[in-house]
Amino acid sequence: MTTIVSVRRNGQVVIGGDGQATLGNTVMKGNVRKVRRLYHDRVIAGFAGGTADAFTLFELFERKLELHQGHLVKAAVELAKDWRTDRMLRKLEALLAVADENASLIITGNGDVVQPENDLIAIGSGGPYAQAAARALLENTELGARDIVEKSLGIAGDICIYTNQFHTIEELASKA
């Protein structure tokens, strides 16, 4: 799997992910970019799960963003509906963490679109470790969103065997 973490703080929203791709118990690649900018660089998205499945979902999500003029929530809901109801899409195994200047969301193949508490997202096999680290840093430090994401990914990479220390991090200015 992987670790993707997103933090929103002090006018910034940041999503970061590690770069490890595994096949069974073998590391196949260590520098996969699991976090991308979409829709004219106004949306950032990260994936946990099968790489091919995730890239398919990125393409579909970008189309939904275009269709709905970049409205993140509407595009996310439409993707989740299609993902849940389409027979072929239902087989895709991935989770998406997406964010724009206004909202941070998790999109699942079960049709869920969740805006998490405190705009903190952590998904993938290292998600629980990254979430615990990010939450502690949010509650007990004045660190910025990027620093929290970097430190959380580092901690997850030290603990989770499916997460490495190659990080891709994207950030946007945030209204929330």
Curated annotation (Swiss-Prot):
This is ATP-dependent protease subunit HslV. It is an enzyme of class 3 (hydrolase). Belongs to the peptidase T1B family. HslV subfamily. Pfam families: Proteasome. Transmembrane segments: none annotated. Its EC number is 3.4.25.2. Keywords: Allosteric enzyme, Cytoplasm, Hydrolase, Metal-binding, Protease, Sodium, Threonine protease. It comes from Pectobacterium carotovorum subsp. carotovorum (strain PC1).
